[in-house]
Amino acid sequence: QHDVEQCHEGHQPFTDAAAALEQQLPGCIAIQCDVASRASCELAFHAVEQAMGKVDVLVCNAGIAQQKLFTDITPEEWQRMLDVNLSGAFHLCQLALPGMIRRKQGRILTVSSMWGQTGGSCEVHYSAAKAGLIGLTKALAKEEGPSGITVNCVAPGVIETDMMAAFTAEDKAALAEETPVGRLGTPEEVAKLLVFLAGEDAGYITGQVFGVNGGLVI
């Protein structure tokens, strides 16, 4: 039996998702949260603790993307990218850790990107933020290991999500052709790895970065 909490900046999409998931997994709740805001994270985390009592697993999956030449990125766009993709994980990890340390157990999972590993042209700010998540994961794993807490990172490749809404069918076909396995990934494939890393069988795995990219990054 697991309780599931989902946080999302826009309330309606995840309210709908939570309602659908509730039919399969009782105990799922949706909470609105802007991870770029410490105050919003604190309110959301308090709501989760009130509803569930404790947080055993934290998945830092919030993210935004933007394709733009580096010389055209505004300071505001740079800061927003870091606030959502990196600082959000910082806020939530700081809120989750005291309880995990007290209980001497916990799982923290961050979701980076293959561009956090290799860098992406025209996505320098995105790549920098996602690379920061990898650094956070590795350092935090060393710091929290003695407290029975594991910290791991999943770095997806080209996955069929809303972030690809602007891509044409031709763009997607070209990306699939570049991928050694010959297709794009699915959210379910990423989720199944996260579920494993959150479970008891992954207790000796920490500080690692797992690529889910069909062989694009080897």
Residue ranges with predicted function:
Residues 146, 153, 176-205, 212-214:
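C-terminal helical subdomain
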Residues 33-43, 75, 188-189:
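The beta1-alpha1 cofactor-binding region of Rossmann-like NAD(H)/NADP(H)-dependent oxidoreductases
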Residues 64, 71-90, 105, 109, ...:
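Catalytic Tyr-X3-Lys loop
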Residues 113:
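Residue(s) in the substrate-gating loop at a strand-loop-helix junction
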Residues 73, 119-127, 139, 167:
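Active-site loop-to-helix junction immediately N-terminal to the catalytic Tyr of the SDR YXXXK motif
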Residues 93, 129, 137:
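Active-site helix of classical SDR
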Residues 69-70, 77-82, 164, 171, ...:
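Substrate-binding pocket helix/loop in short-chain dehydrogenase/reductase
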